[in-house]
Amino acid sequence: MLEKMKMIWQDAKQLKDERGLTLVELLVVVVILGIIAAIAVVAIGGIIENSKKDAMVADAKQMVSAAKLYTASNPVSTATTLRFSGTAGANDADGTQYVDNLKDPFGTGNYTNAYVVITPDGNKYKYTVQLVGSKKAIGQATAVADDTLSKDLVINKTGE
């Protein structure tokens, strides 16, 4: 019994003498935190990119909604372009009265080219969208139908 008490006393004394982390333990903790931080930065970068693409698609859908408002008060008999930014053609309608300035989520200013083409189709209309920003675009080569808009259609801008 006395021998067992001595062992317990020595174990307790040894535990009392331990005062903190060794340098190796501290280094392991720092390395683990660094790995976790690196993984988090990569994951957050993807989330930010996707949210910018979602914002661009939302802008395109907002332009289509503005075009629908336009056709409600201005019936269209031939294909009409409702322009929100860029160089206006002689027959283009002004869409800026329906939507405030659309900001490019990938740049610092407005989109360089933004319009909706309204095409009569029997007793309804078809809407196609082009939205070009500083780095990304939707329908840069060919305008995209409004019912197919998704973030998968946001591509890198060409011709820079």
Label each region the model flagged:
Residues 1-19:
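N-terminal leader/signal peptides at the extreme start of proteins
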Residues 16, 37, 49-52:
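Flexible interhelical turns and helix-capping residues at alpha-helix boundaries
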Residues 20-45:
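N-terminal single-pass transmembrane signal-anchor helix
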Residues 44-64:
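Aliphatic-rich helix starts adjacent to a transmembrane/signal segment
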Residues 60-77:
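N-terminal alpha-helical signal peptides/signal-anchor transmembrane segments
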Residues 77-138, 159:
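Extracellular/periplasmic head regions of type IV pilus-like filament subunits
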Residues 135-160:
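Low-complexity, S/T/G/P-rich flexible repeat/linker segments used as non-globular hinges
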